[in-house]
């Protein structure tokens, strides 16, 4: 008896329209910047919550993930890495600092600005509370980790080599990346072959 392989559950990703709806539902620049970083870098929520101002190199348009302890318990699950970002994200960061962050004395990028204790590092719970509010506003029952899956999927479909994607995600090996996103290679190969008419009008009939 031949056992059929059970298909692995594929990671959920956000369509561009869904991501735009989430960003547009953010009423504060801090919140919009938080999700913009998730979407642009493919970082984990804990890695973004642990960002410090020194980790954002505005001139180079880079965000660095540094493994270390943070007061809010946020941490990087993998080794350090640097992720290139676009100028739009850097401009949003500058707007956030100018319009909302102001003169708050903190090393952390994401802090309490309206809730007490003001200036303290934003917590996982605070971020989750925001997710709940955005779910209610948008009708999208999303998880922040979907931003990570979306970034990886976008990179791979745009032709970025899996070795590079693995490094950007901070995976321990390419094998880890392949185990999660390897289905994209087969899916995209099928799409290309179908577009080329490979499965129709064959000279040899089975």
Describe the role of every protein-language-model region.
Residues 1-21, 113-118:
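Flexible interdomain linker/hinge and immediately adjacent N-terminus
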Residues 7, 16-45, 49, 104:
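Basic, Lys/Arg- and aromatic-enriched nucleic-acid-binding interface segment
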Residues 38-61, 163:
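Short, charged phosphate-coordinating catalytic segments
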Residues 50-56, 166-172, 180-183:
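A short, basic/aromatic helix-end/turn motif that makes direct DNA contacts
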Residues 50-91:
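Conserved tyrosine-mediated DNA breakage-rejoining catalytic core shared by Y-recombinases
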Residues 86-140:
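Active-site/catalytic core of tyrosine-dependent DNA strand-transfer enzymes
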Residues 128-167, 171-174, 194:
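Short, basic (Lys/Arg/His-rich) helix/loop patches that form interaction surfaces
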Residues 196-206:
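C-terminal secondary-structure termini that scaffold catalytic or DNA-interacting sites
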């Amino acid at each position: 008896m031949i056992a059929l392989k059970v298909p692995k559950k594929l990671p959920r990703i956000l369509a561009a329209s869904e991501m735009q709806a989430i960003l547009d539902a953010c009423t504060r620049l801090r919140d919009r910047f938080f999700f913009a970083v998730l979407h642009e870098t493919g970082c984990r929520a804990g890695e973004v919550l642990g960002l410090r101002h020194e980790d954002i190199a505005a001139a180079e348009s880079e965000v660095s993930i540094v493994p270390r302890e943070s007061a809010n318990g946020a941490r990087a699950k993998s080794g350090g890495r640097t992720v290139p970002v676009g100028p739009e994200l850097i401009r949003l960061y500058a707007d956030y600092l100018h319009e909302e962050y102001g003169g708050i004395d903190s090393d952390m990028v994401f802090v309490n600005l309206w809730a007490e204790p003001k200036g303290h590092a934003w917590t996982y719970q605070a971020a989750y509370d925001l997710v709940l509010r955005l779910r209610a506003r948008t009708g999208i029952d999303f998880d922040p980790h979907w931003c990570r899956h979306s970034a990886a999927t976008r990179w791979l479909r745009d032709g970025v080599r899996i070795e590079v994607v693995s490094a950007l995600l901070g995976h321990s090996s390419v094998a880890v990346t392949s185990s999660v996103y390897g289905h994209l290679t087969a899916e995209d190969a099928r799409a290309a072959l179908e577009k080329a008419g490979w499965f129709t009008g064959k000279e040899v009939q089975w």
